[in-house]
Amino acid sequence: MASPPRGWGCGELLLPFMLLGTLCEPGSGQIRYSMPEELDKGSFVGNIAKDLGLEPQELAQRGVRIVSRGRTQLFALNPRSGSLVTAGRIDREELCAQSPLCVVNFNILVENKMKIYGVEVEIIDINDNFPRFRDEELKVKVNENAAAGTRLVLPFARDADVGVNSLRSYQLSSNLHFSLDVVIGTDGQKYPELVLEQPLDREKETVHDLLLTALDGGDPVLSGTTHIRVTVLDANDNAPLFTPSEYSVSVPENIPVGTRLLMLTATDPDEGINGKLTYSFRNEEEKISETFQLDSNLGEISTLQSLDYEESRFYLMEVVAQDGGALVASAKVVVTVQDVNDNAPEVILTSLTSSLSEDCLPGTVIALFSVHDGDSGENGEIACSIPRNLPFKLEKSVDNYYHLVTTRDLDREETSDYNITLTVMDHGTPPLSTESHIPLKVADVNDNPPNFPQASYSTSVPENNPRGVSIFSVTAHDPDSGDNARVTYSLAEDTFQGAPLSSYVSINSDTGVLYALRSFDYEQLRDLQLWVTASDSGNPPLSSNVSLSLFVLDQNDNTPEILYPALPTDGSTGVELAPRSAEPGYLVTKVVAVDKDSGQNAWLSYRLLKASEPGLFAVGLHTGEVRTARALLDRDALKQSLVVAVEDHGQPPLSATVTVTVAVADRIPDILADLGSIKTPIDPEDLDLTLYLVVAVAAVSCVFLAFVIVLLVLRLRRWHKSRLLQAEGSRLAGVPASHFVGVDGVRAFLQTYSHEVSLTADSRKSHLIFPQPNYADTLLSEESCEKSEPLLMSDKVDANKEERRVQQAPPNTDWRFSQAQRPGTSGSQNGDDTGTWPNNQFDTEMLQAMILASASEAADGSSTLGGGAGTMGLSARYGPQFTLQHVPDYRQNVYIPGSNATLTNAAGKRDGKAPAGGNGNKKKSGKKEKK
């Protein structure tokens, strides 16, 4: 059998086939190429980059790749040249068998555009296969009495090539008895038959050897041969006969294995062994013998395995009936396989985007997929669908490819991920369907600012809070995810009371907890207005603000402060006066107190905590007024000591106490006589302070005395010189020496400083007052100096006292008290100028000293008798009324339960000046002395 080389003739056909490979139609979305089979791996098929409108280097950048369904990749892309090349040798006969047109379809995917192009490559057949008989030798039997024209069926040859390269003709070697006739069957196959031309004579020649040659139409021509041995038999008059000679049957592809398809019947009129027929497949192919079974006695054809329409749509076979005399008859059988909807549609995902940003535009491609159904006709028609309530749709692409695209904007906060159910269904009966799930995550975009649950917040913190204590917590929610939802908190920059807001409070940037950076004082700070900003960590970040009102709650941290009577600072005791003639309810004094707190913590109540004479005095609960509870009796002591407690209404309540000393007397001498017995407890620390003050005053006094002595000496020397000059010059009579130094010079010095001895309840302890401006020009006169000069004539005090006892001068009318200055119930009693007031020189001088001390105290705001400025240490009724000029104004915090009165600041009572009438009287006294 001839077997020419496979590559023979291929080189001559390569050039025209390469030219065919450049044919394409890029404008239609379907690219077509042609190429010959059996090219080497990497052979050029077409310039795919050019046909796609791309540069070669863009193939990799754009993700261009080949996609095909369930088939070994026959082609590849050359990224350097942009060409479509073969991935290996392509055998057309293996790929397409006897199909006259061999076309390979696949798709080119441009990944970044989610666009797909169809590519069709036609494989051109070359003459690389020679005709081939199944058997190299065939034995044929024929009766010797066979008539001329008897036909014997010969085996036919097969050529895997198609077209002009397929089988064209047969040739029979030359002989005397037989000729060759070629019959074309209904399937287009050429069947050779041996025709008897001359009668046979078994006795002359028993065996005839012939050579049958099959030729194709290629160039060069390829051929195949088989050897035929014809054996001459004795006579068999009748040959078998099929009626009809061709059989056809259609069966569904899903018939069970072993199903009988049809029964062939042949007849032979001979008898005996010559009439017994046996059936067999002629030229039995392996595929036929594996699929079908032929009963050799009955001629019944049945299935050996399942039929598959998608694998083979029909089967062509030839059945031979042979009798015992070697006569045969043949019949052709065509089994057509009918398609059954037994294949569910198939979904093949070609490209998929697993995550999509929520700000993508409508029409964005999510996935590219293809569908396939192995059935045909309506059974192979496919419909695709997805749920209607999703923001997606399907768009048909080339062939059976579809795009899954968005139809509207996506919102991750509404739906963060989708599981898209893709349903493909064929049109068969019953229809078959397949579901495929396409997952899609929606990537977050920072499109939502943090959101506070409330438009504003308010909270409170008690004053005196510890530093670093947690005040409040705010929380904002961001519906985004990841960094876009990570919220940080901050406070808006601001200043309060000259200090940055960040020095008052801070906020934890992660938790939103506010902390106090200082201890708040309600009396200084009552509320703070803050703006809290919540910002996410997106790009760009989004933020929102909320207002926070922080209120400081008052705590009862301030004890009541007693304004009147003022607490003494020098150990002296203030004295209030109550006449023995006072009736019950007589107003002795009023305790005035304030509390820096507010509200209930500032409500004050007064009570008498302790009294030397219980039941004699009562204190108003809400007013603080000290009044007599009963009439004063003679047996009541001159000095009454009251301890008044002032208490607020806080929790727990705080209180303060003050000791009020009340002098019970109708006359000043009675008061003065007992002043020495009024003492106040002295703190040891006050004694130390007093000692230091005494030492300091003593030192200053020594310096002052030295200066005065030097001044007096100078004055005496000047005066002595002037007297000598007068004696020598004018010889005038001498003037007697005065007992005093010149008062004019001393008074000039006293205009600057003076030392005073204060008569207080503790006068026996020699309290001294610091140097202060002198009021000698208004309180002293030359006459008073002649009467008593304690600074110059201290050694003559006792003599002067004794002289005054003997020679009592008439009282000085300049020191007589006016009606407004006399004791009484705050000027409520009338009387004349000559009352029970000082009627001797001793009383007058005592009152002068007291007035001098009071005037000095009024100048510096001190009080030696505890009565306050300008009170002479007696009572507010005997001097200027109590003023609040040196006290902080807390009147807005004072609430007096049970009374509508509020504290006022009367300008007329704050100047602390003595009555004008007193000063005028002193000036008149000076004029009299000058006269």
From Swiss-Prot:
It is a single-pass type I membrane protein. It comes from Pan troglodytes (Chimpanzee). GO terms for biological process: cell adhesion; homophilic cell adhesion via plasma membrane adhesion molecules; nervous system development. Residues 1-29 form the signal peptide. Its main location: membrane. Potential calcium-dependent cell-adhesion protein. May be involved in the establishment and maintenance of specific neuronal connections in the brain. The lineage of its organism: Eukaryota, Metazoa, Chordata, Craniata, Vertebrata. Residues 809-840 have a biased composition (Polar residues). Residues 714-931 are cytoplasmic. This is Protocadherin gamma-A5. Residues 30-692 are extracellular. Residues 30-133, 134-242, 243-347, 348-452, 453-562, 570-683 form the Cadherin domain. GO terms for cellular component: plasma membrane. InterPro entries: Cadherin-like_dom, Cadherin-like_sf, Cadherin_C, Cadherin_CBD, Cadherin_CS, Cadherin_N, Protocadherin/Cadherin-CA. Glycans are attached at residues 419, 545. Residues 921-931 have a biased composition (Basic residues). The keyword Transmembrane helix applies. The chain crosses the membrane at residues 693-713. GO terms for molecular function: calcium ion binding. It is found in: Cell membrane. SMART domains: CA. Residues 800-840, 901-931 are annotated as: Disordered. Keywords: Calcium, Cell adhesion, Cell membrane, Glycoprotein, Membrane, Repeat, Signal, Transmembrane, Transmembrane helix.
